[in-house]
Amino acid sequence: MLNIFVICTGNSCRRVIGEALLNHLGNGRIKAYSAGSHPIGRINTGALATLNRHNLPPEGYQSQSWKDFEDIPMDIVITVCDNAADETCPVYLSKAIRTHWGVSDPGHVEGSEEEKITAFEETFDLLQLRVQKMLALPLETMLPEELTEKLNTIGKLSLTEGEN
């Protein structure tokens, strides 16, 4: 089983959705964890509501620091925000394959409740597309360089490109 670590700076929205999707769609093939480099101390209620709308359990998520996972050997690290992508990861993550899957922060969307829900749904859909593409790969047997290249390509997919 591969351990996958989803990192975001604030650790309240995107990483929760990413972790939930990886664990749900991974069907025991992978174990996903998530944390933040500078966690804000709470999970965004919009992220939890999005999981609930998709029948994924919203319970058990905490705003955690990446320091809380030092004892778990990570195989793949996925950053989902640009700030986290530019940060230096802790030494314990140095052997992991790193990739960046930039996603706009739905927690920063201003507007009506419908517009906010739409932003979270778009985030969910984009992360779901990328996770599905990743899980279609023979992750366990790929060479690190090949896997890194594929994951980087997946990280550039948009929702419109995923329809092709």
Regions found by a protein language model. Give the residues of each.
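Alpha-helix C-terminal capping/helix-to-coil transition sites in glycosyltransferase folds
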Residues: D71-P73
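Residues at the C-termini of beta-strands that transition into short coil/loop
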Residues: G36, C81, G102-S104
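Glycine-rich nucleotide phosphate-binding loop and flanking beta-alpha elements
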Residues: P58, A84-T88
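Phosphate-binding/catalytic loops
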Residues: T88-N164
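Short glycine-rich anion-binding loops that position phosphate/pyrophosphate groups of nucleotides
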Residues: G10-S12, D82-A85
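Hydrophobic/aromatic beta-strand patches that form the interior of the parallel beta-sheet core
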Residues: Y33, I76-I78, T99-W101
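Conserved active-site segments centered on acidic
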Residues: M1-D68
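Short glycine-/acidic-enriched loop or helix-start segments at secondary-structure transitions
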Residues: V16-G18, N44, E87-P90, E110
